[in-house]
């Protein structure tokens, strides 16, 4: 849950996170601006294998700064393998990041360009660690897929998620969300960039192998507006909309961004 000590604007916004979470100023923070001319094609990168079982979809939860769609992760029915990963990583949840307007919602940038939103699919190293909580702070603990989202055509594959938001309008609300394969939200091409980074909000652990797809997906402006209709407050409290939840890009600090293509 979002603790009240951090947020996305004012005195608990991203530029102040370092006071309570010193790793915010670490050398391997995310997101980054991917400068395509400085990425290196790595022929040793394997193709990605994404295998999600719709039966593992479990619930949707308003966490106060976004919504999470959570998956049953007690077995290997929904896993990410290959690419830059040497082990099998289990799907835990997916969520989106968005901005106040349609032109600035992504966390990762490409050659300085912002996108409308960004989808993150969160996986943990189930080959080495017993649980997500154990993996989350380990250097090889997490693997996140990032999908950049552009406003354009409506995305029919997102509709089931949007329809479920009504049931979780307020912080801490949860509702069943079953029979969904999130691979329908991925772009047709799985060409990707990969680099070592961090969670993009507190606790900001530098434990993430990032896999960012080159190809974008589209959503309509109306669909994106439904994300902003979610409330950051618990029921009965003063209404505060989740208007934005994206961290600005962080310094690369000499890290290499590999390309699969």
From Swiss-Prot:
Name of this protein: Carbonic anhydrase 1
A GO molecular-function annotation: cyanamide hydratase activity
PANTHER family: CARBONIC ANHYDRASE (PTHR18952), CARBONIC ANHYDRASE 1 (PTHR18952:SF282)
Keyword Metal-binding: yes
UniProt keyword annotations, A-Z: Acetylation, Cytoplasm, Lyase, Metal-binding, Zinc
EC identifiers of the protein: 4.2.1.1, 4.2.1.69
Taxonomic source organism: Bos taurus (Bovine)
Annotated ranges, domain Alpha-carbonic anhydrase: 4-261
Active site per UniProt: 65
Reaction catalysed by this enzyme: hydrogencarbonate + H(+) = CO2 + H2O; urea = cyanamide + H2O
Presence of the UniProt keyword Acetylation in the record: yes
Binding positions (substrate): 200-201
Residues with PTM N-acetylalanine: 2
Activity control summary: Inhibited by acetazolamide.
Gene that this polypeptide is encoded by: CA1
Binding-site residues for Zn(2+), renumbered to this chain: 95, 97, 120
Gene3D superfamilies found in the cross-reference section: Alpha carbonic anhydrase
Role this protein plays: Catalyzes the reversible hydration of carbon dioxide. Can hydrate cyanamide to urea.
PROSITE patterns, A to Z: ALPHA_CA_1, ALPHA_CA_2
Signal peptide: none
Cell location: Cytoplasm
Cofactor(s) recorded in Swiss-Prot or TrEMBL: Zn(2+)
A GO CC annotation given for this chain: cytoplasm
């Amino acid at each position: 849950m979002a603790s009240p000590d951090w947020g996305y604007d004012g005195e608990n916004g991203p530029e102040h996170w370092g006071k309570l979470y010193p790793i915010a100023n670490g050398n391997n923070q995310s997101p980054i601006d991917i400068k395509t001319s400085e990425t290196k094609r790595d022929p040793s990168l394997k193709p990605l294998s994404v295998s999600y079982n719709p039966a593992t979809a479990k619930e949707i939860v308003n966490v106060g700064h976004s919504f999470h769609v959570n998956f049953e992760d007690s077995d290997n029915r929904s896993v990410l393998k290959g690419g830059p990963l040497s082990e099998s990583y289990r799907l835990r949840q997916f969520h989106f990041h968005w901005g106040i307007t349609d032109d600035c919602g992504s966390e990762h940038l490409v050659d300085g360009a912002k996108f409308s939103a960004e989808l993150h699919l969160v996986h943990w190293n189930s080959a080495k660690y017993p649980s997500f909580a154990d993996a989350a702070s380990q250097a090889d603990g997490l693997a996140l897929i990032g999908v950049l989202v552009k406003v354009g055509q409506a995305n029919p594959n997102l509709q089931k998620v949007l329809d479920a938001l009504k049931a979780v309008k307020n912080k801490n609300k949860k509702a069943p969300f079953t029979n969904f394969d999130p691979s329908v939200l991925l772009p047709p091409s799985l060409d990707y960039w990969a680099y070592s980074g961090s969670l993009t909000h507190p606790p900001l652990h530098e434990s993430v192998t990032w896999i960012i797809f080159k190809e974008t997906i589209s959503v309509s402006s109306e669909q994106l507006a439904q994300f902003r209709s979610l409330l950051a407050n618990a029921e009965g409290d003063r209404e505060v909309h989740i208007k934005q939840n994206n961290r600005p890009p962080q310094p690369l600090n000499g890290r290499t961004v590999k390309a699969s293509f």
